[in-house]
Amino acid sequence: MALRIGTGIGSDTNAYFAGKNAAVKALSSLGVDVPELGIAFSHYEYPILQINDGIKATLGEKNLVIINSQGNIISNTFKKRSVVLSLLSGHSYYHAVSLVKNLSENPYVAGHHLAWGLLDSLEAKTEKKEIQKKLVLVFGSDSFIQKTELLRGLQEVLGVRFPIAGGIVSSDSSLNPAELSFNRQSSKDGAVGILFAGDNLVIGIGSGHGWIPLGLPKKIKKAERNRIQDLDDMSPLKYYMQYLGKHIDLRNEDITSIATIYPLGLEVEKDSYIVRFPKFFEPGGSIIVDSQVVENQHARLMMGTRKALLEASEKTISKALEPLQKENITPKFVILIAGIERKEILGIDINTEINIIKRKVPETTKVIGIYTRGQFAPLEGHSQLTSPSYYQNGAIFIAAVGIKNA
């Protein structure tokens, strides 16, 4: 039986019924097939175990992953307070799921445990037969600063260039952890991974962000954990004031909008930048971001515009579809993971971004997505299936999933 997917959405006020209604619609969408895996993106305001119970009241005891979100996508629609459930079935692919808790104690070790949990689970399903592993999706609670350490632990086991993507989930602000669960085991200090494998499974991925360099690059001279203290010969505050003007007191104002439009870009390869949104400026001029920063890395002011973000989205979906188009394969589904900060810039154009993606795929292709405050994704504009992933802010990641034609 080929890979099939059914999707459904629930947006009831009551969490139990939101989950239940999403499950009823997803089962109807799936048809006669029996689901083997459920993946639910559930807004952080819903109690996750109530969502679990509502879904399982309809599905029974199937493998179910639930991830808190800032907002969800189904088809061509952005919906904030909702549950979007995807049900997968078929024997033409394999999946493995693993959950780790106490993530903040040692994210690097947690990454190792998560990766080995996925590999052990897959080995048990395939009876140790060698199967091509294609993609890992990983979601972690925003309970820790060392986001890159979680990724490093995963990469040391799975391979630095193995496709790893996902997000960090928080509630109303970054470093305010939201919840995730696997089969009613839930955590606000954990990570869940989903491994997709199969010799006939074809997955294309793309990623980008759309913020463009504005200011001159400066070297990070002094940094401690997630605090940037010195950029060459000046504080981060002075660097910002140099471009935005001295009339804005960034230490006393709510800088959310300013930080979203004008984030910092960290250079990880020549002329390739990942985005970091400032959380706030300290009285001494230091800047706080949501993940650890290394010294001697170049940083520069970036700028986001609607046009540039939408162009990045179009490039991202085109890149994701390339491997499938080369083999004349219709994607069964497309999954999108994106920074909720994109909505701050795009506003009502957030649906334009979604429609750019929807228009690129056939009507039969399901489109689902989750908005988070941090993303794991390859660099913009690189060979996506062989490029290492990085922890980023504001990114858009897309995976297109299909099955080889018989």
Feature locations, PLM:
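Small-residue-enriched flexible segments
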Residues: 1-58, 62-347, 351-360, 365, ...
